[in-house]
Amino acid sequence: MGIIFSKFFSMILIRAMGLNLTSHFFNSPQSIFSTVFVFIAAMIILSIQVILFVWRTPMSELIKTEYRLPIKKMKMTPFRTLMGVLGLILLGVGYYLSLTLRETWTNYITYTQDFSAILWIPLLILFCCITATYLFFDCSLPALLYFLSKPKKRLIKGAKLIAYNNVRAYLQRTWKSYALLTIITAIAISLIGGTMGVISLNYQATNRIYPTSFQVSGEQAGALRTLLEKSDVPITAEQAIPYKMTNMTVQTRYLGELQDESVENMMVNLVALSDYQRLRKLVPGAPEIRLSTDKQAVLFDSQYDVTRSFITYRDEVKVGSQHNFKLIQAEQDYFGDSALRYSLPNVLVIQDEAYQQIKGFTYTIAYLQTEKVQTDALTQLLDEELPIEWAHPLTYEFSDDQKNVRFYPETARDSSSDSGQTTAYRLTLANRFTTMRGVRRQAGIILFVSLFVGVIVLITTSSSLIVRQFSNTEREKYNYRLLTKLGYTRNEVRKLVYWQNIWIFMPGTLLAILHAVFAINTFTQIIDSPGYWVAHLFAAVAAVVYLFAYLITVKLCLRIIET
């Protein structure tokens, strides 16, 4: 089985990483010996634990066959009821903070200027959920079962009444381990879901940075076309987008600032609306924008998915010395690799008429889409003939009033001078194939490890509950048989087993999934991405795993009772 599963997981790893390898089935004596050694070591450790247990436990306790319910401990005192209510309150506080994390940060930091809240509020959410989990199984759930078994206006009898009391007795013995299993399951789902969400986020971000097969500076576009023709790689689509670099004054407000806005003077790349529409033909995922007047603009920021939680822009922006625009929306960057542009992340889309009126330094980036999958031979040819390097230096300096910019193309700043000049460079080429291959292989390794660990945790926790129920059923099978002698039918006893196991599996499963879902929602409050649907999918998979564990437990428990 170990060899078969090893083969299975190696195939998953090769597929996830996109490797061009063949996984052969072979017999590994070293793996067999290592597995045998691990089993022997585990048996030795288990034997030592059993010996210590027998040595420390009195003989009278070992040979005792009857089991007495902890009736005194099962009593619901006012204090336990109060602690049960407190557990539900803590659970609600944790869930509420996870839903309103961004607003809580903003309001608290605005009034206190305590930026440590960025750290301790998520830790407070974690503390509330963990504490509430233990209180839930120690006090809240037993209190609920107690009140369900004490009806006032209706009569509860038969299987449900017995099931409620059996579950209360079970929780009294195992509430600590049950709470721990729930927390471990929630953490496993959260980490796996969070990992897969981050992988999806990274993949989508990389796909957004490299929307086409190649991005190349206008100066090297001809050389790239020649190399692609030599390699028999046809170009299916191409767009050359001009950018105009100039200065922009924008008013921003950071999280927690008491003042209205901070004025920032930065460099920006301008793009005409018609050029943006041409780019959208190659990048269909880019949002559609409409500028009704020549005084409206849309800002694209490569860090917007992260900074949107901490920075807000004011509507009015000023480009150059005298051109004012109204910022109608802010979006993520869909213009490809920002390293191919001067002034890096910011791109401002404006009407064509306004674009022509503004002065600045103009340069071009060509976006090429190819049909064939890039081969290693083409990759090596590009590395030799058209290496990726920082080139095209552009030196610029602001005027004394910070309203105008003077440019010095193809000139690097003299490092010995203190003239206030700044030199910017840009990359010559961006290759989608090599970058996406590296991202996929890295994501494949992380995905393989996270899924392997997560599946092991789910199987271990569900198996632990199954084994505990087997032990509990074996100990109480004579009580079940006694019920048949007291007049309960076979269907009523089976209903009791179904109903009791529902209360064993359902609360922990629902609570673990709720913890995981709200934890994932906390992640979305920090970094927004559509990739978190994978995390919710894995939470559904966990629910299915526990459903199968429940069905297996019920069937085997019935077999133990009825044989």
Predicted regions and their residues:
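Alpha-helical membrane-protein architecture signal
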Residues: 156-164, 168, 178, 439-445, ...
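Selective transmembrane-helix segments that form parts of the transport pathway or gating/packing helices
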Residues: 1-3, 75-84, 495-513
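A hydrophobic alpha-helix feature that marks transmembrane segments and, especially
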Residues: 455-479
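Alpha-helical transmembrane segments, especially those used as permease/efflux helices
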Residues: 37-41, 72-202, 515, 537-556
